[in-house]
């Protein structure tokens, strides 16, 4: 994620997955796979992370809708599990100007 770019925020990785699906034509499932299991494989970390398995580190999010149906469901994170801790309804400071402009491409 290019955090230093003014039009890419630290909280909008879901958009990159959505654009990958919309503009390249991959399935929602494949977009999620590339961001998790495949990314860990390319980073040489597939034995440590990238999937939810016994003995692996597993940071994950909970959303109310199914991202396999619509990747925009990832926009509304209800819970985060990270390093064994729960963050319930995480608060994220959102740049409204950036969001409004980027929403034009959804």
Which residues make up each language-model segment?
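C-terminal cap of metal-dependent C-N hydrolases
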Residues: 35-37, 41, 54-100
